Amino acid sequence: MERMKKYFAHIWLDDFRSPMIPQTENIAWVKTYDEFVTQVKAFGKDISSCIVHFDHDLGEDKDGYDCAKWLIDWCLENDYGVPDYDIQSANPVGRKNIESVFESYWKVFFNKESKYEAV
C-alpha cells in the first residue's frame, strides 16, 4: 500500500465549504483571490512542498481559474516549484479550466501531460 504524501501545508481555496482535511495537518483556508495571493506569498519557496485544493466559483470577480493562472506565473517568476493540486469544484467547466492551466504548464516546460506521467 502506498503511503500518502506529507505536505508542508494545505491551501484550501473555497468560499463556502470548510476544509475536508484532518485537523492534524497545517491548513490555510482562503476564500478569495486576494487571500490566496497573500497566503501563497507568505509560504514563499515552501509553496513547492504544499498542495492547493481549488474550488472554481468563489462568488466574486476572480475565481479558482484566475488563482491557478496567477500561481503558475508567480512560481515561474520566482523560480519556485509548482505545488501539487487537487480540485474539489462541483463546476465541471471550471474544473476543466483549472486542470488545463496545470496541463499546459507540464506540456510547455516538461513535455509531459502531467506531473505524474512516466518519463
Where are these regions (language model features)?
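Catalytic phosphate/metal-binding cores of nucleic-acid and nucleotide-processing enzymes, i.e., regions
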Residues: 1-119
